Amino acid sequence: SIILLLFFGNKEPEITFTNQQMQISGIYGNDYNLSDIESVTLINERPVTTFKTNGFDMGGIKKGHFNVQNEGNCLLFVSGTGKCIRLKTKSDVIYINFADETKTEELYGKLEGMVK
């Protein structure tokens, strides 16, 4: 079971869009209504976490619930060290990035066009 946790924990989430929803796959993934997303922002670096409340944290990969400095409890899907997307929904703050910064920027462009 530890091997499975390492495998799924190290795997980047897939993010798909269907029926006015954003689906984040994998461990700690969920479905979010696009209408519930209040803002989407591209920030230059990943958030500073103070501690993990329920998540996976290994080798710079952070997935799950973390306390973020100056924000409190947030949901992270962070694999890279560069730019990061910050989503504010009606109920959560979510940070997403990928090891490939271009992939992060492409997702941001897509979200920015979908969120009104």
Model-derived features: where do they sit?
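Short, conserved beta-strand/beta-arch hydrophobic-aromatic motifs that form part
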Residues: 1
